[in-house]
Amino acid sequence: MKKFEWKSVLALALTGVLALGLTACGSSDSKTADAGSAAAADGKAVYRTLDEIKESGTINIGVFSDKNPFGYVDENGEYQGYDVYYARRLGEDLGVDVNFVSTEAANRIEYLQTGKVDVILANFTVTPVRAEEVDFASPYMNVSLGVVSKDDNVITSLDNWNADDSIIVISGTTAETYLIANYPDIPLQKFDSYATAKEAFENGTSVAWANDNTEVIAFALQNEGYTVGIPSLGSADTIAPAVSKGNTTLLDWINDEIVALGEENFFHADYEATLADTYGLDYEDSLVVEGGKVNAQ
């Protein structure tokens, strides 16, 4: 698909989406605060309360380190991206330092349940199943699934699938869950990280890659020779911060913070600083959720 066609595709893909929630990062990813760094012996989730985080002077936030423009490490070794921008503001308003902990999609829940992180800001789509294991705060972005393929073999439908072909997914994502439930006969190639999935796709190991539509659209815009033939697959969802199940003090603070940030249009500023170069400004209002209010755009 030619470059000038991308605006119409992106508009169709994103205006129908409900809400996007992004993730945020910090300054280091090798350390976590002492409190809550290991799982309880009985297997129950462990977490630090809001006061404990304040007393420690550091909040541990799980973010992606390889998913540009949402969460990635730049050439200077610094975390950048939409989620990182938000994470730094959380730390600033809480009055603590941010310790960024690199996470993969498959271990987001585990990192919360074992106390490795206090908050996950890593493109975490809200689903009923996940909500049984973690507590989601109010959303800050809209998202649905999308499928990208090569220009010379554009995939526009998953019906009548060739059994010899496969689709790449990242383990622990909604794309994996959706395809297993709705297209059980389609072979899946599963990878643990965005980077390994991207490399495999570029090497031609599968004919398509399914992921959040914002991510596959960004990939196609940034890499010649690829088209998002399915810009919206399944239902529209939202992305939100997540904390350990039962950590009400931290959850309530984050929800109040999201409302306060909405009054200054913080997530629009975040978008313009981190996502505008990829998606442009025309889609800002359809992607951003302010104040946790999905229908307030």
List each model region and its residues.
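C-terminal motif of bacterial Sec signal peptides marking the signal peptidase cleavage site
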Residues: 20-24
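Extended ligand-binding regions for polar small-molecule ligands
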Residues: 26-28, 34, 38-39, 84-93, ...
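Ligand-binding clefts/hinges and TM-proximal coupling segments of bilobed small-molecule sensing domains
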Residues: 27, 40, 44, 174-191, ...
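Extracytoplasmic small-molecule ligand-binding "clamshell" domains
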Residues: 36-123
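A ligand-binding cleft/hinge motif common to bilobed small-molecule-binding domains
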Residues: 124-132, 180, 202-203, 207-236
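Periplasmic-binding protein-like
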Residues: 142-149, 217-258, 278-297
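Flexible hinge/capping segments at coil-to-helix
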Residues: 149-166
